Amino acid sequence: MQGYLEQIKPSVGDAWRTDELYVKVGGNMKYLYALMYDETRFWIAQQVADTKYTANINPLFKEGKELTGKRPNTLISDGARNFNEGFKKEFFTVSNPRTRHIKHIRLQVDHNNNKMERFNGEVRDREKVMRGLKTVYTPILKGYQIYHNYMRSHEALNNKTPAEACGIKVEGENKWVSLIQNASAKNLGF
């Protein structure tokens, strides 16, 4: 199903957020890096790494560019060194328009990371119920990304899913079944 969904380009805007959160994998602490479109909360890409500040997150940003077909005009992060290095490698350009990296988050102004922190709490709540993940290669995180984007409606989006807010409509009473059927039909060439 993931391959099917990767062929659908979400209509995302120019402001993206990124952050990391720790997750327990096989009894060890790992870090889940996530990239999200600010306005609709569409979870664009993810990456699991062993370390927090030194992990190479270029693949996360590269996947985001490939999925959306663009780079953001603004990237909001907590300013960790690896976010800045990934930004320079994947998003920075000398030609205009240049992508701006907002890396100093403040609580009282527009440049906070509250949406991303709320998202982190959502993922952490799910992981806590599961008592951690068994392996880095688990399909649970990709499945949760699908659930977050295509199934879970958000009150702040007028009870739409992030995918619906990005122009992707999943028809049917049971969206899981619809996505599975669509992915199967695509793979069979119907």
PLM feature segments, named:
Residues 46-68:
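Active-site beta-loop-alpha junctions of metal-dependent nucleic acid enzymes
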Residues 103-124:
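RNase H-like two-metal-ion nuclease catalytic core shared by retroviral integrases
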Residues 28, 83-89:
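A short acidic (Asp/Glu
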Residues 11-25, 34-36:
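Two-metal-ion RNase H-like nuclease active-site motif
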Residues 19, 35, 41, 75-78, ...:
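Mobile genetic element proteins and their domesticated derivatives, centered on retroelements
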Residues 71-83:
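Acidic/histidine-rich, metal-coordinating catalytic segments
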Residues 129-190:
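C-terminal domain-tail junction helix/linker
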Residues 1-14:
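Short, basic alpha-helical nucleic acid-contact segments in DNA-binding proteins
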